[in-house]
Amino acid sequence: MGIKHLYQLIQEHSPDAIKTGEIKNQFGRKVAIDASMSIYSFLIAVRSDGQQLMSETGETTSHLMGLFYRTLRMVDNGIKPLYVFDGAPPKLKSGELAKRFQRKSEAHAAAEEAKETGTAEDVEKFSRRTVRVTREHNEECRRLLKLMGIPFIIAPTEAEAQCATLARGGKVYAAASEDMDTLTFNTPILLRHLTFSEQRKEPILEIHLDKVLEGLEMEREQPQFIDLCILLGCDYLDPIKGIGPSTALKLIRDHKTLEGVVAHIQSDQKKLTLPEDWPFADARQLFLEPDVCPADAPECDFKWEAPDIEGLVKFLVEEKHFNEDRVRNGAAKLQKNMKSAQQSRLEGFFKPVERTPEEKASLKRKADEKLSEKKKKQKEEAKAKKQAKSKPRTAG
């Protein structure tokens, strides 16, 4: 689910944080991809009759089809993908997962009814809601990635947190996920829409956390941004009814921390009421110190290798009944691209030099002066406008 309305807030307050571009702009970059989110998106790409892609024997193959061809597309555009799978969910998330399972059970019953009485739109809508990524889906995807020579890791808990750790540790350029809580886990750069199909013609969104914080007037070192995300609504806690994005931002700006916000709500319960059990400090700690594999651990020493073409044919063609020509052509292309992947973009050769504290202070001072000058000018313009209005008109 991620963080409710966070993207909307970023669009309003930090538009400079979002860059849009084509997939080819990511050439030469290593990217950590939230595998579970990607697999889910492949599974919900149902056909017009509400059914997923299946083999001749009735097995679902949407996840394998999506993973194989989207990965080929990324490698074809010079990207080095690595996939991160979810581990066990944190205890706080179990309540949210139970609710999701209940919603899917209800949606499954509604989908069956829609097939009998509903429109095509009803069938598709409810079919999407019943989709669940299973252990078997994950195992098959990991088997496919191994045969393709694409590295992967199973996170101790949340895939998004592990992706963020790898990006922060310099193992990859960015974390790729549709879940906005990847930013809450402190990834410097988040890529969205990277695993979308080419037919959707959606641009790749590149969101820079430092610019997000700048627009929201928050510091990276303080947990204000995390507190804002929890208040907006995250996977760990029930949302507070009546708090939308604008209210959440105002509350955090006025009261600085969730402790301050909670005290304010408890002092006047006529307007807002906290859920009965709302352990926000535990949720904050999960974002601040998630259970992850450190970026410098041996498990995070990733290698991209040549694909096992015959192994791919055996798995995808013989077992899953994919078209052999398409699989062989894709595997040959993958092999060729892996060989030429040594060519890297300039960022790999020229590491950015860290600014000195004096340079940082100078830049901040200049930015503050610029802002002060802008406010002064606006004030003078407003004053002149007011004076012009108050002047009596002379008779012509």
Swiss-Prot record:
Residue numbers binding Mg(2+) 1: D34, D86, E158, E160
UniProt record similarity statement: Belongs to the XPG/RAD2 endonuclease family. FEN1 subfamily.
EC numbers, comma separated: 3.1.-.-
Keywords: DNA damage, DNA repair, DNA replication, Endonuclease, Exonuclease, Hydrolase, Magnesium, Metal-binding, Mitochondrion, Nuclease, Nucleus, Phosphoprotein
GO terms classed as biological process: base-excision repair; DNA replication, removal of RNA primer
UniProt feature, compositional bias: Basic residues: 385-396
Lineage: Eukaryota, Fungi, Dikarya, Ascomycota, Pezizomycotina
Protein name as catalogued: Flap endonuclease 1
Gene that encodes the chain: FEN1
Functional summary from the UniProt entry: Structure-specific nuclease with 5'-flap endonuclease and 5'-3' exonuclease activities involved in DNA replication and repair. During DNA replication, cleaves the 5'-overhanging flap structure that is generated by displacement synthesis when DNA polymerase encounters the 5'-end of a downstream Okazaki fragment. It enters the flap from the 5'-end and then tracks to cleave the flap base, leaving a nick for ligation. Also involved in the long patch base excision repair (LP-BER) pathway, by cleaving within the apurinic/apyrimidinic (AP) site-terminated flap.
EC top class named in words: hydrolase
Listed Basic and acidic residues bias regions: 352-384
Native source organism of the sequence: Phaeosphaeria nodorum (strain SN15 / ATCC MYA-4574 / FGSC 10173)
PTM comment: Phosphorylated. Phosphorylation upon DNA damage induces relocalization to the nuclear plasma.
Positions that bind Mg(2+) 2: D179, D181, D235
Subcellular location: Nucleus, Nucleolus; Nucleus, Nucleoplasm; Mitochondrion
Subunit structure: Interacts with PCNA. Three molecules of FEN1 bind to one PCNA trimer with each molecule binding to one PCNA monomer. PCNA stimulates the nuclease activity without altering cleavage specificity.
A cellular component annotation (GO) from this entry: nucleoplasm
I-domain: region residues: 122-255
UniProt-listed CDD domains: H3TH_FEN1-Euk, PIN_FEN1
UniProt-annotated binding residues for DNA: R47, R70, E158, G233, D235
Keyword Metal-binding among UniProt keywords: yes
